[in-house]
C-alpha cells in the first residue's frame, strides 16, 4: 500500500454523538437477528483488518469465550490513548461517540473498509459489557463500558509493555438480540474470506465452549480463493492473475475458466464485499468480453460483425475482483455499501483487464480457443434450453398436453397474484390434506410425487425433462434460467412443506438448489419460505389440546405443566388431517414459516456444493454442524450467504 500518514489523537474526528442506537438498532446494523448479531463482530474485526491493510498488523485472533462474549485481538499500532480535542481520552471518544474514528480522511488510512468508528461505538451500544485493552507507546491501558455504552472504568494505565495492538472483548445484550449466541461456522467462513483477501495475514478462531480451533493464512490469497471456488470443477485455463494500478486505484484480480455451466464473480472494494456488484464488476466484465471478442475477430474465428454473447462468454468463469480505492474517491450506492458507485473504478478496471487479457489471449492461443469453443457450445446449449423452456410454456395453451398439470396443481381462486401462496408439498397423502384444509381463496397446492432432480449435477436442458421440475416451472409461471422474470410470478409466497425428518430436509435442499441455480431472484426478492409443521400434539384429559413445534418447547412445557396429558409425536405431514394441517401449518395467523434469504453468495456456493456434491463426509459434517429440525425464530435466514 502507499504511504500512510500519522495515526494519533489529531487524526480522530467526531461527526455526531451516539444517540438512539439501542432504541433503533436496525438503523445501524440492519436487524436484531442472527445477521445483526454477527455484524457487531464484523465491525470490530474489520477495524483490525484495516490496520493490516495499512501495513501495521500481521495477526488477528478471535476467541468465542465460555460466557458467550467474544474477544478480538490484533497486533496493530493500538488505538491512540492521548486526550482528544473534545477533552476526553481518545478511546472513550471512539467507543462512545457515533461517527468517531480515524478513517474519515486519508491521513491515518489511505483506504479502509468504511467508517469503522461507527461500528465500535454501535457494538458498544448494543453490548452488556465492552472492554478494550490497548498496547501502545510501551504502555497498557484499559477502558470498560457496561449496559449499552455507560462508562464503567475510565481509561486507566495498567502496566508497561513492548507489545502493540488492541484487544476488544464484548458481550452482546441478549435483551436486544433474538438469539445472542455466536455461530462458529459463520464466523469461520468470514475470517477465512478476510485471510484470502489479505495475503500473508494470519487469522485464528478459537471456540472455548466446543474446543474448536481454525487458523487461516494464505501467501497467494486470491489464487487460493479461486481454487476454493473452483473446487472439483474441471478447469479450462490456468488461474490468471492481474495486478495493476491506475488513478490511485489498485486492481487485483484472479480468474479461471471451467467446464461448469455457472459463473461465479465476486467483487470487493477496500475489503468490503459488494454483494450487488458495482462499477468495478461492470468494468471487469466489459474489459474481458471486449478482449475475447476482439481476439476472436482478429483470429478469424468469428465472422466480421458477429459477436459472442456476454452471458455465453462468462459461462464457467470463476473470478475474484478486488479494488483498493482512496477514501476521497470511494462512493457506494445506498447505505449498506453493497454496490460500488465510484465511476473511475469502471474505466480503470476495464482498461487494465482489456490490456492484460488481450496480451494473454495472444500468448495462450490454445487455451484462448478453448474458451471461445466453450462459449460457442454454451450458445448452442442456451438455444436448446430456450427451446425446451418454450416447449414447457406452450403446455399451458395445448389442451391435449395439459395433462402435465392435470391432477397436480390445485390453483388458488384469488386474482391478486402477490397475495396468493403456492405450497410445494411432499407426497400425495399430505397433498390431499393440504388441498382439503387450505384457504382456496389464496392458497394453491402442488404435491411433489416423484423425485426432484439434483440441480447441482444436471445441466438445465436435462433438468427441463424432469416432470416435477416442469410442474414447478409451470406453476410459478415466470420462466427459468436466464429467461426467468420475477415480475411474472403467479404467487407472492412459494412455501416448501415437507416432513420434519432427513428425507424432508433432502427435498427442501433439492428445491432450494433448483431455485438458487435457476430462479435465484425468487430468493433474492424473499419469495421462498419453508413451512414448519409441529412435532408434538398435547391432548389433556378434558380433550383440549395444544401443539408444540420442537424439543425446546416440549421441555419448557414439561417444566411448567401440572395437568395430565397424552402426547403424539408426528412422524410426517400425512398423520395430520386437513383441519390440523390448516391450524398448525397453513393458517397465516398461527403457522410458523422460515423465510429463505441470501446475504452471502460465497457461503451459498459452498453450502450447495457441500450438500449436493459427491463428498459424503463433508456433507455429513455440514449437516451435523448446521441442520437442526427445531425452531429458533419465526423467521430464520437459512441461507446466510451475497448474490
Curated annotation (Swiss-Prot):
- What keywords were assigned to this record? ATP-binding, Cytoplasm, DNA-binding, Isomerase, Magnesium, Metal-binding, Nucleotide-binding, Topoisomerase
The organism named in the record is: Mycoplasma capricolum subsp. capricolum (strain California kid / ATCC 27343 / NCTC 10154)
Q: Which gene encodes it?
A: parE
User: What's the family?
Assistant: Belongs to the type II topoisomerase family. ParE type 2 subfamily.
A Pfam family annotated for this UniProt entry: HATPase_c
Name the UniProt record assigns to this protein? DNA topoisomerase 4 subunit B
Which free-text remark accompanies the cofactor?
Answer: Binds two Mg(2+) per subunit. The magnesium ions form salt bridges with both the protein and the DNA. Can also accept other divalent metal cations, such as Mn(2+) or Ca(2+).
Q: Which residues carry the site feature described as Interaction with DNA?
A: 451, 454
Q: Give the catalysed reaction(s), semicolon-separated.
A: ATP-dependent breakage, passage and rejoining of double-stranded DNA
Function per UniProt: Topoisomerase IV is essential for chromosome segregation. It relaxes supercoiled DNA. Performs the decatenation events required during the replication of a circular DNA molecule.
Name a biological process GO annotation. Answer: DNA topological change
